[in-house]
Structures are given as structure tokens and as C-alpha cells.
Amino acid sequence: MYKQSLLSASIVLALSSTSAFADDYALFDEVVVSATRTNQTLINTAASVTVISDKQIEENMAKDVNEIFEYTPGVTMNSSSRQGAQTINIRGMEGKRVKILVDGSSQPGSFDGGPYAFINSSGISIDPDMLKSVEIIKGAASSLHGSDAIGGVVAFETKDPSDFLKDGEDFGGQAKLSYSSEDNSFSEHVALANRFGDLETLVAYTRRDGEELQNFRDSNNLENYAVEDQDTSADNLLVKLQYQLNESHRIEFLAELIKDTSDSDIYHSSYDSYTGADDTEQNRFAIKHIWFADGAIADTVTSKVSYISKEENGVTKRFKPAGPGFPPYVPANNDNLQTKDYEYTEDKLEIETQLDKEINNHYLVYGATYTHSDISNTNMEYNSDTATDDKLYVYTPDAKEQKFGLFVQDEISLMNDKLIVTPGVRFDHFSTDPGKNTGESLTDFSDSAVTGRLGSTYKLTDTGTIFGQISQGFRAPSFDELYYTYDNPGHGYVNDPNPDLKSETSISYELGYRHNTQASSSEIAAYYSDYDDFIETVVTKKVGGTTHYSNVNLDSATIKGVEFSNTLLWDVLVGAPKGISTHFVASYTEGEDGNGNALNSVNPWNAVLGLNYDAPNQNWGTSLKLNYTANKSGSDINFDDESGGNAGQAELPSATVVDLTAYYKPMKDLTIRGGVFNLTNEEYYRWNDIRGDDELYKENSQAERNYGISAKYEF
């Protein structure tokens, strides 16, 4: 059966990949895991999946999560200038609609404080140098991954000891130094791997230090809450122990410790000083047991227990001298230093068991998952002026979330493996139990759902394959969507809770074609998703000068679009000099609610062209990338704030950004890389960064022309 003959040689399907060499041009497929929970070749996967390898991350000189997806149309980041990466957007679906996995473990959730950045909490903590690959499922994957995967999955996989132990060696590793003028950042990375008989170990550490983004801001004309100066640091420690007990049993241990800090000077016209100190600590521990059972009900049983503890603390200090005016609670005759101490904590326990069984032309995958999360979210306000009371703000109650899932999938190979049909079904139960620390009596929430999926691939010829799928999605509302309360009428903003929210449901359709030859690789896919009870934040009422917001269920929403990618190896195609390749990829998405209003979460269409050259001796190479983003204006924007839009929303101009990178290997194990980014020094913006703004504020622009350099030594 096809499962027993997988070829893991990678082709250059990501846009930044430089070409391989003529002897290696048999364009075999990458192996993906997240889309089917099995090791499946991409060509036999009935879904759009993008794979970004560690090689591509290196070639792009990515130094943070934002830059990992820089050249992946259809995938964008939502970020905060103060706190960095927040959530991932896939085809207009974002936040808790996109499931984030690291080594198969669900990550802590994000928290969106609306207009108040000091109470945001990120859902992503990962360092690019630790990654072996990133898999992106574009579209609903609830039947395999549960509630949070209604909009897709991003699966990060960290490196293993075997990635550094070459040719049977018992010791290996790498050391890397890098610098970027984009934010004046330095990083140091080291990884050490060992083999002691049947035990393999890995210890890897990365340190990063940087400053604020060097963009097109005008320091003399800043808007309130703009970051003026910033110092950042990040520490990431990864430890793995993998022990092959015997032929039947393997056990793996993992520990990851992450600490991110930033200190920001923030501009605000109403304060003499305004600072923010943000610290995130996240610890992840996991143990996995693999049993090669070769039994009647399973060939392999994989069991995993993971625990993640996250604590995010943001301290905001703002000083207002004595005198009348904003804010109104500052007495006229007293100075006041106000300190807001915000804390978000989440402890998540996840247990999962998966059984794999091959029976004739069937490959069965079935199992169960259980997740328990304890979440806390509070803010304490202290005032140096004794006439102003200290206050405790509880934006959401302490909450306990529980998720339980059962899943089964069958990959059926027919017609001598030309046709593969993959039905799957999953049952999910979700519950949220709010605590009593808000002083209010809040109702519990629980819901259950059965979701299904039917996918298929059919090999038309030796080089052409069509694929398609119909998949259902389900997402229960998160604790903050149910209970988030922010009452600040003095600033004209109130967010009301809505514990009566319903779960979102969806049905998605996708149809595509893949074509692989010795000289080219192409894919085109069209997709359509229909959502019911779509959860959106809208204006519910206006009372005097106060606007009330709340999360509500919209009757429906639709998202549709098309994506295309093509890689050409020009030496094989037309006899050009060896090592020349191009890669083109484009993504177009549009979305609207049931009333025909545009979904502002949908990004404008985007296309990237990469021109690559690798010298035949593999000692040097270069890549030129053109990244085009279309404008977003007019009917593509929802200006109605009562249906989830933004009144007065600024329009986004189109932009073309040019990046140039190169590498040189003066010796076998030493690689020096350099790059010039935004080569033409174009002032440009990302749609996600200006959503909600009434004009293009320069402090929200992307980096001006900048350069980066790195040196990596492998041993």
C-alpha cells in the first residue's frame, strides 16, 4: 500500500525555496502530518497544505513568527507594536478560529483587549531557530483537530536530536549568530545533540535582543499609544530526550522554557510619561510513548501527555501632573502616577491517544483527546494620588475550560492507489465554567458537536492529480467572548458580556489540481466556506457619548477564493544555467456576512514571485523576491460598526516590496547569509495593522530599507 513507500525528499514548494541540483530534480513530495494525522505525501493529501521547512526559514532569514509567513500568501499575522505577534490569519479566519500546535500540543489561547493593548495576550510563543517545519492547513480541520480548527491549523514542529546527528555520528550541533538593522536586533543560538546507545538528547538555546521597529514614523507627529522607544529580549531553551527502549517501545521527553520581555516608552498627549513593561513566561513539558504493537486493533499506539503553564504580565505606568483636564479623575491640585498591573495566566493539561491500523487497502486512525485549562485574567490599578482610589479590574472571570474529543478516519486506497478516499468523523464536547471572582452570577456554557469530512485524491496521469474535500467545522465560543467585560464610560467605551452566544458551525468545499514533473510543480485550488452563527464584535447600542460593544452571533458569513502556486526549474525546462529556478504563488480571498457586508478580517489579494540561483558547487546562491499586496478599499471594507465593521476605516494602498538575499559557504560547515529587505525603501502597511484606524498612521508602517546578516557553523 502507498503508506509503505513514502518518499520524504522535499521539493521546493514554498516560495522562497532555492532550487536543488539537476541530479535531485525528481520532484518528490513532501510528507505532511497535520492534515491527516498520518505521514502522508502532499500529492495524496485532499486539502491545501503549505509546508515551510527549516531550510526555507533560514533562507528567508526569519527572526520571528511574523517573518516565517512573510512569503506565504493567504497567511498573515496580527501583531501589536507593543507586544509583538498575537494571532495568525488564514484566508480571513483568525484568532481562536485557527488552532496553533507545537509538537502536536495545543497552545494557550490569545486574549484580545479591544482598543486597550495593555490587556492583550498572545497565542504564539516560538523561536524560528528551534523549528524543523511549519505545516499550514488552509481550511476547516475540526474533524481531526477539534473546535479551534474551524479556520485551519498551524502546526509547528521543533527540531529533534536526529536532525543534528549526521551519518551515524554520536555528537552534532550548530552555533549561529545574526543581526538585523530592522530593529537593531542581535541573536545567538546553539544546539548540541548526543547519542548514547539507544538514547538521543538535544539541548538548544536562543537569545534575542532588539529595539523598536525602524519604520517610516514621524517622531514629531505621533498618535496616542504609539511606541516611541523599546527594548526587547527573548530566551528560549529546548531540551529533548528520546529513548528507544526496545523494538516495540519508544519514549520521548520534552521541556521548553520561554521568556519574552519588552520595555516600551509610549506616546500619549495627555500624559507626561507613559511606559509599558511586558513579560511572558511559558513552560511546556511533554512525554510521549510510542508502542509498535503490531496487534489486532492497532499497529502503532501513540500516547502523549503535555502540560503548558503561561503567565503574561503587563505593567503600564502613566504620569499626569497636577492640573485640570483629561483624565477627569485626576484632581486639579495633585500629581498622579497611575500603575496598571495586568496579569493573564493559563495552565493547560492535554492528554491524547492515537491508534493506527493498516488493513489491506485501509489505513485507520482513531483516538481520543482531553484538554483541561485554568484561566485567570485580572488588572490592578494603583494611584500615587491618595485622593484617587486603587481599583481591581476583573475583565473576565476565572474560568475552567474542558474539551473532550473522539475521532476516527479511514484512508482507503483504490484502483491501484490511483484513487484515495478519506472519510472522517469526530465528536467534541466543550464546557466553560466561570468562577465567582467578578461578584456576578454567570452561567456555565457547554455544547457538543459531530463534524465530518470526506476528502479524495485521484491520479489522472503520472504527473497530474485532482483533489477535493467537503468538511464541517465547529467552534465553541471562548471564555473571553462569553464573559469579557470592560466598563469605561469616561472614555466612551463599554464592552458587555454575552453568555448566550451559540457555537459557530461551518461547511467548506475545496477543489484543486496538482501537477508535478521533473521541471515544474504547480497547484491550483478553489474554496468556499459557509459559516452559521458567526461570532463577531459589533456595536450594540450608543448611550450619550458611550458606545457599547459585545460579541454576537451573525446569521451567516461566507468566505471564498482561489490560490495558485508554481515552481519552475529552468535548467531542466529549457537548458538554462544549472541552479536557476522561479517560484510564483498568489492568493485571492473575499468574504461577506449574511447582509452582504465585507468581512474586514479578509486580507487583500497577495502574490509573490521568487527568482533563485544556486551555484552548481553549492557554495553560494541568491534569491530576489517581489511581494505584491493589492489595495483594499470601497466595497472590500465594511464601514458599518453595527455589523462588525469600522466606521471611518482607512483604505489600504497597494504595495510591492523587493527583498534580496544571498549566501556563501567559505567552507563545508560554515554558511554566511546576508539580505537587503524593502530594497526600494517603499512605505507600506499591512491590512491587519491598520484595521480600526481612520487614517494611515506612519507609526503603523512596516520597516524601511534594512539589512540582515548571519553566520552558522554546523558540527
Residue ranges and their predicted role:
Residues 224, 363-464, 487:
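Signature of Gram-negative outer-membrane beta-barrel scaffolds
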Residues 228-230, 248-298, 309-345, 385-386, ...:
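Flexible loop and strand-edge segments within Gram-negative outer membrane beta-barrel domains
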